[in-house]
Amino acid sequence: MLLNGDCSENLKKEEGTSEPPRENGLDEGEPGDETTGQEVIVIQDTGFSVKILAPGIEPFSLQVSPQEMVQEIHQVLMDREDTCHRTCFSLHLDGNMLDHFSELRSVEGLQEGSVLRVVEEPYTVREARIHVRHVRDLLKSLDPSDAFNGVDCNSLSFLSVFTDGDLGDSGKRKKGLEMDPIDCTPPEYILPGSRERPLCPLQPQNRDWKPLQCLKVLTMSGWNPPPGNRKMHGDLMYLFVITAEDRQVSITASTRGFYLNQSTAYHFNPKPASPRFLSHSLVELLNQISPTFKKNFAVLQKKRVQRHPFERIATPFQVYSWTAPQAEHAMDCVRAEDAYTSRLGYEEHIPGQTRDWNEELQTTRELPRKNLPERLLRERAIFKVHSDFTAAATRGAMAVIDGNVMAINPSEETKMQMFIWNNIFFSLGFDVRDHYKDFGGDVAAYVAPTNDLNGVRTYNAVDVEGLYTLGTVVVDYRGYRVTAQSIIPGILERDQEQSVIYGSIDFGKTVVSHPRYLELLERTSRPLKILRHRVLNDRDEEVELCSSVECKGIIGNDGRHYILDLLRTFPPDLNFLPVPGEELPEECSRAGFPRTHRHKLCCLRQELVDAFVEHRYLLFMKLAALQLMQQKASKVETTTSLENGGLPSSAETKSEDSIGPEAGCEEEGSSVSGLAKVKELAETIASDDGTVDPRSREVIRNACKAVGSISSTAFDIRFNPDIFSPGVRFPESCQDEVRDQKQLLKDAAAFLLSCQIPGLVKDCTEYAVLPMDGATLAEVMRQRGINMRYLGKVLDLVLRSPARDQLDHIYKIGIGELITRSAKHIFKTYLQGVELSGLSAAISHFLNCFLSSYPNPVAHLPADELLSKKRNKRRKNRPPGAADNTAWAVMTPQELWKNICHEAKNYFDFTLECDSVDQAVETYGLQKITLLREISLKTGIQILLKEYSFDSRHKPAFTEEDVLNIFPVVKHVNPKASDAFHFFQSGQAKVQQGFLKEGCELINEALNLFNNVYGAMHVEICACLRLLARLHYIMGDYAEALSNQQKAVLMSERVMGIEHPNTIQEYMHLALYCFASSQLSTALSLLYRARYLMLLVFGEDHPEMALLDNNIGLVLHGVMEYDLSLRFLENALAVTTKYHGPKALKVALSHHLVARVYESKAEFRSALQHEKEGYTIYKTQLGEDHEKTKESSEYLKCLTQQAVALQRTMNEIYRNGSSANIPPLKFTAPSMTSVLEQLNVINGILFIPLSQKDLENLKAEVARRHQLQEANRNRDKAEEQPMAPEPEPEPERAVEDMGSPQTAKEGPSSLNLQG
């Protein structure tokens, strides 16, 4: 049992500062979240077991939990091997039928040992359809085609290929230490230095995918639906089946079950055929008529249940694969039916026809949230309806672009058309009625939906009761952007002018306000840092707003208050919005800003606003502390300086104007004394009785004024989002406020350039963050509030950095990202001019121009373009993609690359030094396969899995047949499990303080809550499992570590992608736990897989590759593959030296690992040479007396003795020839324990078997050293890396030296203590 919120409270108490007044900032709980009360949670109700009696099988026991629903037992039975063929049944307890949707704890008389009877129910058409669909799913359960096709939330996983199935108990039966040498040899393309980057190993063939054919055909019969007279006999529908033995049969699905009828393909005869066998289950009927079906279906189900559940559970959002093998297209009745209906008749358990998405989305928000069980129920409902809405919206958007949905305004031009499908409203990203004329036209219309989505995301997170947003999904597909929104009840019957009662429909000319909206939005203004302000409307009346003018308030027919058009929720980014007569701070003009962007909707990110406010808060504390100290020191001086309105001169007088955005940037948190001042200030301001003395009040007033706070009694920074909006006017009386707000915006723009971008580069230099591909680089930038349009500036700073070599990987990733983003911008407009019939030809031509060395690829026009001269004239109502345009076919590689360079300069302000792909590869060290992956992921292209000869100058790399599909790229809201997240963070904090057991309990609790809200599959659950696995490993429970990490790998593959950098990390962790569990060949397979993926995603030269190669080298050393081991360890040494410098402790460790292998090979001279290098580094860095230096010195002596002994023996042989009588030399094969110790060291895991008291002393000592270091070196890394707000913990870094004082600051989890 835990007290909710207790941990975070304790953490704050431990820090022990009572802070001065602060009205906003980052340390608030989730607004609108009433979790602060001490409330007791009891999540784990004890489970109990019930007995299940099903027809035709032995009774069996089932473990259930009281908060499960009866429906969940249904699901379990539909999944079990022996009952999976039943779908239409009810459960009875003592003769009473149980309600599907009731919780087990509410069922009277249900207890330990109760007997539940499975009773077959009569079918309806809907139940018969569900049954056929379920049988089809069982037949296809091992077939990966749905995952390759991106259907029904299926996605790929390949872990089982490398682990030979499950790692649990079966792992113990595998070869342990008897190693088959073949297992150790990596494929040639994985070895260090290999230039080959094959694509096929990305998706290895899984032997379970060789389909066992149970039936040749199972499809709906052409005789459907049954005629009236047959309906009255109970016929529901007819099926047509061809068995594996080539027998054709027609089957009737009736209310009582399934039986054969006498119909043929051309003759309808519904009478029962022989054998006259009526079965409630279609599977039982097919078992009767086909021996092959009976045999193969049983084998199939056995294999299905042996697979790990995580390989088959649906993911919450669809994940698409950018490559797929050539698949045969098989007949599939369910797929065919899905394609031509919208599944409206039988959406899962939804009564009526289509779902009312808006009502569902808003009702779930209205659920109660006073205590934890209520909040869990609410968050689960919100998450479920969001993932369903996203799936439906994606499907609808594709149908709209493919031309399969009728427009609601069909007579208008295609760009202006709007659509409604399945109760969702769809609009295209074009500037329809010159709405965005002043903001950038179509370009602004393309950007506005994502800005709006960010606004929806933010308001949803603040979660104010009574304020509603629309369900919003933005879909990019075939070059078009489609916005899908839920529909406000009644909005289609009224004019927009009548509906809008708050905000403006014409960007600020006419503006209205409403007291209820002001009241609701006021509650969001603090967490969102939005200033309540007044503007003038077209009649020069003052109107009060608490949002940007574009934000509209509409009361729906359901009485709810909706806000929409949230595209300016955050303040404008002045670096990309030149305003005549406005000067930007020097930091901006030095960097070449302001720059004219192609639209005027550039906003600062929420993360930037939060970081800026946090930075200003620290500055506020420092200024106030400084004044207070000087008040104490000299009252006279202080009085004078305060009267002059300045600050005391001891730390360079800074007046209000000179508080630049970068003030305090470098010094932030740079000394222990700074924090002490802040604490002292807090204590001084808040005296015992809670009053504030007048002098302190004066101090606060001055500090508030200096940092731009809107209040003079407390720190409170907010932004006016309408500042610099074209067309928005402010009253005369607000001029001072407007001037201050303009200055604040300028400071924020400069803060981004002077603090955030250098901070990012610094973090990259110190390897606090390790992006591996474009997506992870973008994520790292966005976490710091840096928009992608600043990518060119980031790269400029990297180029000018003194640590340029240490940032080689960042530069390479950044250039690749810049090129592929520029190519994506061009591809978008390129695709809009392509007819559906020319899509694969156009995409393959684009890829050839982009990536192939073939100098002049020729586009293959669709055949009808060449033949048909008489094109029909009916072209008005064509789908958006149906332009009569073959302009795409004339593009050349030279032209495309010229455009890419132009786009890079224009958009990112970066000059690319290349005019072809080969030049780009050569100049920047890029890989074509990596560029192919990046462009495919960004645009939704799926290509054939095969080896492409990019470098051939005789034929183009891609043909039409190589482009298999184009998928949508979907942006949507990600609802959060807030309570689970708080537990996860508290658990992380406990672990970092060394309290492993308490941390483990909190993380376990978080896992339960995450599962409760998200179901079994989610990115955040993946992070949770990884941390749990590591904790269990440190605490010595290898089996549990293995089980959790296996789940983490499977989940990462399924929800993030099989080659996502996170998946690569997970593979490495799993390999370590496998090695510790003596599964050596599996450990190597996993490490080889990780290395292959890293080579594909980035290439050879990444700091993380050093860690990976050290792992591989150590394992190979352990299995006595010394030559192979050296190849990897020496590569790791080279990479470590490059990125950390030749004198780093990590390099010393690397030398030591290489020396050990040479010792095992009895090549003592090389071993000595490497160990000497290591010894020199230890001696220089740590001094003679450090334990590491001594260890190295001892090892050197030992090596010298062995070398002398060997030399003596050799001399003996030379002297006496073969008759010499010499004792055999002892070569030491490394023990598994010593290898594991070294593996733990390089992976940043430290075991300290100490008593509790020793542990406490050690913690105190570590803390003391840490503080000393901060004070002495002014290089406190720990403070500059606060715990990330994301649930994803940073990848743990390897620790170079366990005994060194550097250890404690090496990375987030580098120091793990075990009691």
Curated annotation (Swiss-Prot):
Stretch list, region Disordered: 1-35, 638-672, 1268-1315
Location(s), subcellular: Cytoplasm; Cytoplasmic granule
GO BP, one annotated term: intracellular distribution of mitochondria
Ranges annotated as biased composition (Basic and acidic residues): 9-25, 1268-1280
The keyword Phosphoprotein is annotated on this UniProt entry: yes
Domain Clu: 335-577
Main location (coarse class): cytoplasm
InterPro entries per record: CLU-central, CLU_dom, CLU_N, CLU_prot, GSKIP_dom_sf, TPR-like_helical_dom_sf
Modified positions (Phosphoserine) in chain numbering: S279, S281, S655, S725
TPR repeat start and end residues: 980-1013, 1022-1055, 1106-1139, 1148-1181
Matches recorded under SUPFAM superfamilies: Hypothetical protein c14orf129, hspc210, TPR-like
GO cellular component: cytoplasm
Keywords assigned: Cytoplasm, Phosphoprotein, Repeat, TPR repeat
UniProt cross-references to PROSITE patterns, sorted A to Z: CLU (PS51823)
GO molecular function: mRNA binding
Domain of life: Eukaryota
HAMAP family for the chain: CLU
Annotated function: mRNA-binding protein involved in proper cytoplasmic distribution of mitochondria. Specifically binds mRNAs of nuclear-encoded mitochondrial proteins in the cytoplasm and regulates transport or translation of these transcripts close to mitochondria, playing a role in mitochondrial biogenesis.
Family designation: Belongs to the CLU family.
Record's protein name: Clustered mitochondria protein homolog
Organism name: Mus musculus (Mouse)
Gene name per UniProt: Cluh
